[in-house]
Amino acid sequence: MTVDNLSAVNYPLSTIHCQPSTAMQPVKLYPSVFERIDQWPIYKLSQDRRRFIEEIDEFTLNRLVNEHPKLYNLITETIYLERIRLKESPWKVDPPNEMQFWNRLRAKIVKTESETKQQALETHKELILRIIHRYSTEIVGTFSIATFRFARLFLYNFFNRLLNAAAERWWRFLSSRNRLHERIQVYGEVEMIRDLMKKGIVIVVPTHFSNIDSILVGFAMDQIVGLPSFSYGAGLNLYNSGAAAFFMNRLGAYRVDRRKKNAIYLETLKTMSMLSIVRGTNTLFFPGGTRSRNGMVETRLKMGLLGTAVEAQRVLCEQNLAKENKKISESTRPEPTKIYIVPLVMSYHFVLEAPFLIRQHLQITGKEKYIAGRSEGNSIREWLKFIWQFFAKKSDIILSFGKPMDVMGNFVDENGDSFDARNNPLHISDYFTTEGGVTQDLQREEEYTKLLAERIVDRFHRENIVLSSHIVAFTAFNMLRANNDTFDLYALLRLLPDDFIFPIESFTAAIEAVQHALFELEEKKRLKLSDIIRLPAAQLLEDGVKNLGVYHVRKPLLFNKKGDIESDDFNTLFYYHNRLENFGLTKRVRWENYKMEMRIGEFKPETEII
């Protein structure tokens, strides 16, 4: 049954604004969980950096030796790939002696062909260890209290200055933190997360839409939620900038070089992540691996770093078992240090890089079917303009913290105890126990990682907070598709936006139908709605169009002089529409009931690059 059939019974159009509220309120401003920065796990790890690197080197070497019977092939393949990397994509941040290093290793590996089997094995181990150590010293960052305090003060004053300058009212200076809190709104299980910080290790896994995500998440967790700094990955290319390199080198970031695809580097990176978690370091990483190119909430996650959380939990279980000197009854046995996974969903009215990201996505998926049009700039000037306008205009940014889980995807309570779907208590160590002991089984842990990824994806969708801009973009693009149902996606995107009008009455009626569907999904706890979604459709439509892609030169949607809706850019409209894909909304509305108008009698797909 479609929404159109249900609306008259369940959600009368005249009372749609009276839908019960979920009573979501932004969290208050919290003090720091740990008053002293030298108590932070990331600082303690940095203080023991040399020993930490030694642990990485030793662990990675042992694993590679055990998993790769032919070390010669492993080394030669690594040298080959690294030499290609240096020739085809050199970066300013690369060490000046990089090519010399790999040339020397190539000369040494050739000499092993004349050595005895045992001599060659020892030489191979030595060479692999040298490679690992070069990688580990590059990857592992540091954390400086002085630099952190400077960065915190700088960001606070920077945002404060923008707020006052943009508002042109200096008397608001004293309330700037509260006004920033109004712009960056935080919802969810914050109290529980703060409690769990003192009981175990917290790993925050956010959705990823924009390059500004890292700054906003870090700022919100520090200034609003009061959490200590997390370890996080930063692309090595960012270190090409001297200023960026200075700060990231000293703020707990570990460096990730996405050019390096060889097995030794990837194993070293995963080992670093796993051992840092075992040492108690709270970590943040984007499980999707990169920004969402199509604008959808992630449905597929990268298993590499996510798997290190599962492995780290097993290692912690092993350590806990080793500390026990006698057998303890099942009812009284102590739990090991727990790892808690916290999904975090970012919700924006805008993504500065949206035109660039969707163009990349369409070029990859459409290939010859997709013809690129004009693009907006993504320069430093555009970024500065974006930051300025963000503070000059009220455009919400939402951070929704999900309910914490253990590494198996089971929910935990405020004490950190795990429970299954029937609310039965669980011991996390049971998942890693075979014949009475905690055992390593990498294949089993791969399956656990897949289960965890599925749970995170599910929570990403359930914790997603729908904004007014999401609903108007979703509605508009589905109207466009229904009114041009003979075209495939790429032909649809080649249509000239100037030829189409979304009549205000038809658009408003379609918005009402989508509202009905969203209320049903909210009732089933499939997603969350911002309070503005409960307003009458006309008000919701006005707010959504006003906020949608507010910083883009070519607007996804805008009002024309007659009060109807038009679009400057179907590609970007498609991007923002995708935010509500994968929720089953499309099939709940009879889109053919909502007609569009054309300015000309006949229109054809655009065939020239514009």
Annotated model-derived regions:
Residues T2-S7, L13-L284, G289-I610:
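Membrane-interfacial terminal anchoring regions of lipid-handling membrane enzymes
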